[in-house]
């Protein structure tokens, strides 16, 4: 315990860390992370990967493109780069190794492509930015603004993958027929609809980002149970993993709030 008479600065820092995350808007972060974990366990991530593979796997270095596109789709649904890296990476790393891609290359692609989730809505970072702006920037406006840079970042990563794939002679995958593309799209349709429901609802003003995150959890949970890839007995582990990820993210936010106050107080 601290002597507040002698250490007022440390007391203030602790207060700033606590008040920094005392916001209703920040409740969206743990819920979006939970939605991402449910999608990972519930087979939703697999369906997104298969749909992405049907679109771009025939290009040189095809599985790397699949990784990027699947990360963009998953990040656009879960709102979390961590969730995208975990869900897509846990599936794609082994698949890419089986196809002869170096593990370092597949890991690099997964790490860089997951950052598109920081920009493509619903993004946890944009929610934090809206909060830090003191209300001058709306979440809906930031979400609309995040699409173009997020897509451009994904295309830039794909462009570099094309250069590496051609240089190193990575193999092409099998070209999917229109029927196969339609089949995988149909299987991923309800997963993709989550993006429309969440972002569309926020932009249209039907619900807030926090309310949208709860809807995302309920939608993902029902979908996972319908698909049958996740059982009720797995929910405690899903909640625990989500809590661990949330703890890391929220700790970063509260310490950044304290550092921001410290810089302001010291006139840096």
Where are these regions (language model features)?
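Alpha-helical transmembrane segments of multi-pass membrane transport proteins
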Residues: 1-268
């Amino acid at each position: 315990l601290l002597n507040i008479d002698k250490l007022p600065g440390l007391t203030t820092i602790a207060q700033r860390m606590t008040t920094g995350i005392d916001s209703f808007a920040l409740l969206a972060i743990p819920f979006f992370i939970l939605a991402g974990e449910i999608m990972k366990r519930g087979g939703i991530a697999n369906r997104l990967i298969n749909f992405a593979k049907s679109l771009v796997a025939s290009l040189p270095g095809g599985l790397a493109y699949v990784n990027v596109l699947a990360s963009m789709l998953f990040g656009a649904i879960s709102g979390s780069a961590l969730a995208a890296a975990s869900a897509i990476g846990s599936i794609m790393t082994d698949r890419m190794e089986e196809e002869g891609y170096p593990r370092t290359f597949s890991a690099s692609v997964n790490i860089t492509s997951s950052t598109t989730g920081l920009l493509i809505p619903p993004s946890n970072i944009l929610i934090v930015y809206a909060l830090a702006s003191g209300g001058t920037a709306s979440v809906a406006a930031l979400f609309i603004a995040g699409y173009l840079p997020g897509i451009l970042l994904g295309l830039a990563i794909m462009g570099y993958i094309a250069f590496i794939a051609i240089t190193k002679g990575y193999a092409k995958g099998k070209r999917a027929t229109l029927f196969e593309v339609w089949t995988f799209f149909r299987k991923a349709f309800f997963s993709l609809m989550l993006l429309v429901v969440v972002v569309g609802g926020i932009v249209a003003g039907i619900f807030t980002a926090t309310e949208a995150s709860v809807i995302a959890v309920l939608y993902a949970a029902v979908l996972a149970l319908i698909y049958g890839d996740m059982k009720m007995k797995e929910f405690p582990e899903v909640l625990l993993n989500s809590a661990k990820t949330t703890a890391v993210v929220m700790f970063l936010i509260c310490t950044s709030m304290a550092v921001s106050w410290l810089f302001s107080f010291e006139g840096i």
